Amino acid sequence: MGLQFGFSAVQSGKRVMQSSNEPTLTANSTKAKFSLTGAVTRIMGLVPGDTVQFISNVADIDAAIAERDAEVVAWCEANNVEFGTEAARAALIQTFGEYGICKGVPLFEKDGKVKLVGVRMTAEQKAAAFELNKEKIAEELGKSVEEITIDDYIPVTRAYSGARTSTSSNLNGVGLPLTFSDSSMWNELKENLGEDAEKINRVFEVKLNEPFSVAVETGRVIGDEKETVEVSVYKIVFQSDEEPSVRQSAK
């Protein structure tokens, strides 16, 4: 039986951690945290502050279940799982589920306006940014500089799909190890670990030599069509479950 499911945007033995030169994505023991090695960020062209988006075929699997696809029903019968149950869905995803990652794309409102999101800042960072941008803020609000206060300042930036990356170093540029947070995908990719999810680093190999294209929605609607852009996706494949080092497990 040749069940296949298309990708769309989303969302074993233990050993010591492998070299960071390997192209890997790690779902860390720290809840929601992911790590990318420099080998991956270099090929994907990621710098700190860029976003990473997960791509999967789970939506297509769910659609096939909802439509009672004949091949899916037959697979469940052949594998002694009751179609329509959570156990059947979990078995289908475990068998046929595939995941990948891509660089996030700029997002728009339905009418084509650039989508903006709030910027997280400490009180000190916000105060400093307010002082530097007083004139621009006043102009945007149609007030004088003397009239505005820091409460008038709501820092925003352009929205991108996916989760924003960061680095623990002061370096910048392509090829750095990066981290990001995605609680939904962390839970999904570590679901079968149960209570051990926060005790294990789950490592995935990133197939850098086998990129493929997937259409990702931008949020803009043109006529009756949702705008999409083609992105390069790199498939991730389970490699190992590993015990975190003392430094990695510190929270």
Pin down the residues of each PLM region:
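Active-site scaffold segments
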Residues: 177
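Charged, low-complexity interaction regions
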Residues: 81-85
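Short proline/glycine-enriched turn/loop segments at secondary-structure junctions
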Residues: 219-226
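Long, compositionally biased stretches
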Residues: 1-30, 43-67, 90-174, 182, ...
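Disulfide-bonded cysteine-rich modules in secreted/extracellular proteins
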Residues: 72-79
